[in-house]
């Protein structure tokens, strides 16, 4: 099952996920010019869930035609496992995406790179869950962190503002999200779990929206393009690819691959928002790519999970 071709296929899915997420930072920051964080996340996750419903119906009908009448449509998986995974993922996603959206007022590139500090938090938290990490993978993590530093701290000093601290807290939320997916993705249908997580996150965001924000229809209409992009592509497509792509991969390797989402907002911010890309930031991008290449070498193919 853990063949080289399977590893590269899953890696390609996570790289595509990173590209989608990275470009979405621009949409998230633009959307915040018109609506609050809870409104934005309620709308984008509702769209994400609705995007997946036709796929679920289509694949379910295909399974019914191909499976024998007495076969289990969930391959032996209990529905409660699917719902537990989806709801827990949705709660983690709600916490992480809310903190990220509130803290998005920092520069697009900086927000992306601080968020990607989950590449350190995932292996550290994984140790408590008895998931070993090869020394060479730790080396790749250190190289990636060096790249993060070059891109985040452009003046050479380690200074964090209020918005940066919120985004840093969201990195812990995404760490929990990755580890929850690592646990449940081999057990359940990835598309169904993704759909449940979106509706869970949307409901939680909508409750907070009603309590803490005033919804303005005119502002919502002005933000419809960023919401559509973040909802359909970043949420509906991106997070679903994450669940499918993480299946069978070590969570630390998966987090390193997805950390390239931080390179894409820098490039997107440079292209669309005219945020300057210095030689220091370019060096950071190169180090990030080097770390990703390193974990793809043959010596990194082992899963190293302890049962």
Regions flagged by a language model, labelled:
Residues 24-25, 53-114, 150, 231-249:
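Specific transmembrane alpha-helical segments of multi-pass solute transporters/efflux pumps
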Residues 43, 111-117, 181-202, 235-271:
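Helix-helix packing/entry segments at the starts of transmembrane helices
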Residues 31, 40, 44, 103, ...:
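Hydrophobic/aromatic residues within transmembrane alpha-helices
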Residues 48-52, 121-128, 156-213, 241, ...:
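Transmembrane alpha-helical segments that form core, pore/gating elements
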Residues 51-56, 118-139, 263-282:
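C-terminal transmembrane-helix exit sites in multi-pass transporters
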Residues 6-11, 34-42, 78-82, 138, ...:
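Juxtamembrane helix-entry segments on the extracytoplasmic side of multipass membrane proteins
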Residues 1-43, 90-91, 95, 99, ...:
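Glycine-/small-residue-enriched transmembrane alpha-helix faces in small-molecule transporters
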Residues 52, 133-153, 205, 259, ...:
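Hydrophobic transmembrane alpha-helices of multi-pass small-molecule transport proteins
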């Amino acid at each position: 099952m853990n063949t080289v071709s399977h590893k590269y296929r899953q890696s390609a899915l996570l790289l595509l996920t990173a590209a989608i997420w990275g470009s979405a930072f621009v949409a998230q920051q633009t959307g915040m010019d018109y609506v609050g964080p809870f409104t934005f996340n309620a709308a984008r996750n509702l769209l994400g869930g609705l995007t997946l419903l036709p796929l679920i119906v289509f694949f379910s009908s295909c399974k019914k035609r191909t499976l024998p009448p007495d076969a289990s449509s969930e391959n032996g998986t209990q529905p409660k496992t699917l719902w537990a995974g989806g709801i827990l993922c949705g709660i983690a996603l709600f916490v992480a995406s809310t903190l990220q959206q509130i803290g998005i007022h920092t520069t697009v590139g900086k927000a992306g790179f601080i968020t990607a500090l989950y590449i350190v938090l995932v292996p550290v938290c994984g140790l408590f869950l008895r998931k070993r990490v090869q020394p060479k993978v730790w080396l790749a993590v250190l190289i990636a962190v060096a790249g993060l530093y070059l891109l985040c701290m452009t003046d050479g000093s380690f200074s964090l503002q209020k918005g940066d601290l919120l985004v840093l807290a969201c990195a812990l939320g995404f760490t929990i999200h990755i580890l929850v997916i690592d646990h449940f993705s081999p057990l359940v249908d990835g598309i169904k779990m993704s759909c449940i997580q979106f509706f869970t996150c949307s409901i939680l965001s909508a409750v907070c929206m009603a309590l803490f924000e005033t919804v303005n229809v005119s502002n919502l209409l002005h933000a419809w393009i960023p919401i559509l992009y973040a909802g359909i592509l970043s949420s509906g497509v991106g997070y679903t690819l994450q669940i499918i792509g993480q299946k069978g991969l070590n969570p630390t390797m998966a987090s390193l691959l997805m950390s390239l989402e931080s390179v894409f907002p820098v490039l997107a911010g440079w292209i669309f928002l005219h945020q300057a890309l210095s030689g220091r930031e370019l060096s950071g991008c190169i180090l990030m790519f080097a770390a990703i290449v390193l974990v793809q070498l043959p010596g990194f193919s082992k899963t190293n999970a302890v049962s």
